[in-house]
Amino acid sequence: ARGLGDEGITLDAGAETQESDLPAIGKSAAGIITALNYSPYLDTPKNKDFVKRYKAQFGPDAIPSLASMGAYDAMHVIAEMIKATDGKRDGEAAMAAIKGYSWESPRGPVSIDPETREITQNIYIREVKPVEGGLMGNVPIFTYENVVEPWHAMQKK
C-alpha cells in the first residue's frame, strides 16, 4: 500500500486493514474506510473488558482480531449448548437450545435466526485513524444495527 496515496489511489478493503496488518501499511492507511462486524476500538464496556483480558492473556501489544472475536463468540455458543444439554452428546437438543438465541458480544448484540441459523449483528463502518501507542486502528464511525445476512433476507421477501 506504500505509495498508493501519492498516486491518488484509494484502497477499498475489509479485513485487509485488520490491526495485525496495519503496522506494515503504516500511516498510508489513514482514511481507509471499511465495513466489518468488529473493531477492537468499539467503545463499549463489554468490548473494553474483552480487549483488556485479551491483552492480559497474550501480551500488552496484542490486539484482538476478527478471527479471535469469532473464536470467542463460537466458544460462547458452544458453552451454551453444553449447558443446555447438561454435557450430554445430544446434537438435536444442542441445536434446539440456540434457535433464536441472542447475547451481548464484545462486538455488540448478536442473535441466531431460529429458521436459518444465520446471525443478526451490527456492521461497523470503520476508518483507519491513529490510536494509542502511535499505531493505526480501525475506529468505528457509524453503526448499521441488527444486520441480517443478505442472502436469507432476500429469500424472505
Enumerate the predicted regions with their spans:
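Extracytosolic ligand-binding ectodomains
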Residues: 1-157
